[in-house]
């Protein structure tokens, strides 16, 4: 058998070793090692055991075979990154000046396996129960009788109900199991990341009549999907113009093609309302991924995505790296938001990274915003992106009245307050009607304080 070699990135973030080291793949591990998997390797003069990521496999080497080291083992708890995400990590490294290990760890939000949640079930193992029931009654075995009668009606019940609601001890269950009356089975299940209230909304979406502009956009997207054309679209729509309805319909077209979609939102705080909205259309085939989930919950959602158990994943930046096998569409809502730019190395931008992942996967990207970023708008105007414009609100809803007040005029009139006379009058008017008011203070903007004196 021809010897194979693996290019391995060491799990140490340091520029001095920010390159691939080639190791021999032992024959016993050939079937287990593939691009993206984690391996244990001897490293350095002392052959200290380190973890590394395989980023390539070859049957050739430029090094002296007698001086090469051999991979020790495959990490049993490690998670392999799909090959395309490894390629994306390489792109992040080159474009954002990070180390390869940092880039790999970025595209792998879940790095270790987590023990599955195991649910135990109790079921009847016999068809005829009359004699057994009579025997339990004669012995006054109340707990056994209670469980037997419950199983006659439900056939199979979770162990949690047996020991909780029915008050049957584990010893009693074991005794009935030894008698051959019942069987106990185990089944792994995914951790729930959405509330019961959200799950009740499944497929409860109202019938919405799309307007001509929405239909025109959706039909164009459908034509591109049918022709296997993949591009980046900028959906420039005013607030309330129905961009979310367009997202839903475009996702439907992608799912009909047997593919999957990622929806990025700028803030975790928007997760609840977003997941609730999409659940109405896609039921439990939609899930959420964000940093508020436990490691087990995140692991389960990525496993669901990898196995094709979900069609839509919603979340902030990190959701971009969901390991879908058949990714067809990435949607970035409020694409102008600064939160899509990572503050930690590698300081990647989710918008640009999404476009690159779409290129690698053969997918499309929709950037949505009422106020697009200058970069995206320029690319749309130059033809690099396809521009969709929605300049009217749905159902003839009017735009909110907006007033711009020049505080320099207020100063000339002697008003040195941060509240203009017009704003003070409007506040007084609304309070007199027992209405509520929201005042936004610019403390998180580019300039936290502005005072114009002339």
Residue ranges and their predicted role:
Residues 356-368, 373-444, 448-453:
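Conserved interdomain linker/interface between the two RecA-like ATPase lobes of SF2 helicase motors
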